[in-house]
Structures are given as structure tokens and as C-alpha cells.
Amino acid sequence: MADLDDIKDGKDFRTDQPQKNIPFTLKGCGALDWGMQSRLSRIFNPKTGKTVMLAFDHGYFQGPTTGLERIDINIAPLFEHADVLMCTRGILRSVVPPATNRPVVLRASGANSILAELSNEAVALSMDDAVRLNSCAVAAQVYIGSEYEHQSIKNIIQLVDAGMKVGMPTMAVTGVGKDMVRDQRYFSLATRIAAEMGAQIIKTYYVEKGFERIVAGCPVPIVIAGGKKLPEREALEMCWQAIDQGASGVDMGRNIFQSDHPVAMMKAVQAVVHHNETADRAYELYLSEKQ
């Protein structure tokens, strides 16, 4: 029982000072529940509103691709330099130490491989397991215009509905079919559909013409995919252009772990995203850090 001795009435209520109601300023997320906003605040740095995610979930359909042969050797040293880790539950449980203390976005779609039609995915993770693993969001592909468009959209809807019950954000990842044109019109369509279905974060590709229109037409935060490996200077330029045109962060994989100096590249990307450094300045940082 609590000690009831020496209880004193409160006196300093500051009646002349109204309680502060601090708004949640992440784009399109002001009306979400406290738990979901809390998870989003771990993904997006509250001071900058941006994020640098490290994606190493490629094995769910590619297997042990270049740079991901040994997660424990090649990727683990990068954990401390990332804001967020994006991986599958299998890799999380088997390789990522719980003491890593980084927010995790769990890959939640799968059941396909590079040997078959990539757009034929199913939900590959229960929301109970996502909560059990203390993840901050789940992620699934959405393949607009593909053979399995309908199923991929249903996957997003299923995850959003399940996530709303437990305060778990869903990140929709815009996949591109073999014959799809990667242009502003396509990604404006894909990102908007995913947001309309309720996804709280959209991951999509940067395009040189009209990317700012993609961002403007999407009511929730957009993070860009790194895509195929580029020379480091080009990758940093892509990051800078995307952030300058309204992206809320990057989710990079191959342009980090396939770099000759992955830690230096992570630091350079962080400089662009969180410190507004130009691509030139960030590349200078990369060159200095790799020595």
C-alpha cells in the first residue's frame, strides 16, 4: 500500500499558463493514434522530419545477392550508422542482435522469387509477429499495372487494416513491372493509389523529371529507393535532388552495401538527408571518410 503520511496538496498549477499541445507535423499523419505516431517518430527523426533507412531485405526474392552473402559480416557494421533497418523477420531473428537498438521496418510481402513473376506476392507476415518483434512498420510491394495488381493492392489493404488495430504503420513499396515506364505519371499514379488505400509511408523511385509533382500529389511521406548500384557521386546527387524536391528520406541498399566503402557512404548520405549538404560536399565527406 502507498505511504499516506505527509501528503501535501498541490499548489503550483500555473493557471496562467495553458497546457502545450505539441502538434505531430509529419506529413499527413497528424490524425493517427499515439502508438502509430510514436513508431513513426522513431522512423523519421523528429528534429529533421527525415530518415535514412538501410534496406537489406533483398534476399526474400533474390537470395544471397552480391553484398548480402553474409549479413553478419557485411551488413552488421552498418547498423549503427542507419536510422532504420529494413529486413525480413528471418534475418532479424537470426542475425540482428536485439541490443542493436535501431527501429525496424519488416518486409511483410513475399512468396515469390526472381525465377517467376515478381508481382505475384502474398502477405508473408502476421501483425502479431510484427508486434512481437517490436517493429516500427511493415512494408509490402504494390505493383500498379502488373498482372497481379489487384492482389498486391489487397495485400496493402490487409496490412493497413491489421496495422490500425495495433498502431503499426504500413509502408507501400512501388514495384515496377518489366514493361513499365519509370516516369512521373506512373509513380504519381502508384504512390497516390497506395496512399489512398491507407499506407502511412510510400517508398518509390526518384525520377529526374517531375519528382516534385509525385511528392506534391502524395499526402503522406515519400522515401526514395536506392535502386541499382550507381557510382557514389551519382547516388549522392540522386539523394540530394530527391530531398530538395520534397522527399522525406531514403531507403538505400545496393548503393550502400555494394559500395567500396559502405560506412563512408552511409555517413555521406546522412549528411545529405539530415544536414542539407550538397552532393559535392557529401562526396568530399565520402572521400575523406574512406581513407
From Swiss-Prot:
Cross-referenced Pfam families: DeoC
GO molecular function: acyltransferase activity, transferring groups other than amino-acyl groups; fructose-bisphosphate aldolase activity
Keywords assigned: Cytoplasm, Schiff base, Transferase
Subunit-structure text: Homodecamer.
Enzyme class: transferase
Function: Involved in the degradation of phospho-AI-2, thereby terminating induction of the lsr operon and closing the AI-2 signaling cycle. Catalyzes the transfer of an acetyl moiety from 3-hydroxy-5-phosphonooxypentane-2,4-dione to CoA to form glycerone phosphate and acetyl-CoA.
Enzyme Commission identifier(s): 2.3.1.245
Any one GO cellular component localisation term in the record: cytoplasm
Active site residues per record: K203
Protein name (record): 3-hydroxy-5-phosphonooxypentane-2,4-dione thiolase
Keyword Cytoplasm: yes
Origin superkingdom: Bacteria
Statement: the UniProt record of this protein carries the keyword Transferase: yes
Catalytic function, reaction form: dihydroxyacetone phosphate + acetyl-CoA = 3-hydroxy-2,4-dioxopentyl phosphate + CoA
Intrachain S-S bonds: none
SUPFAM superfamilies assigned: Aldolase
Compartments where found: Cytoplasm
Family: Belongs to the DeoC/FbaB aldolase family.
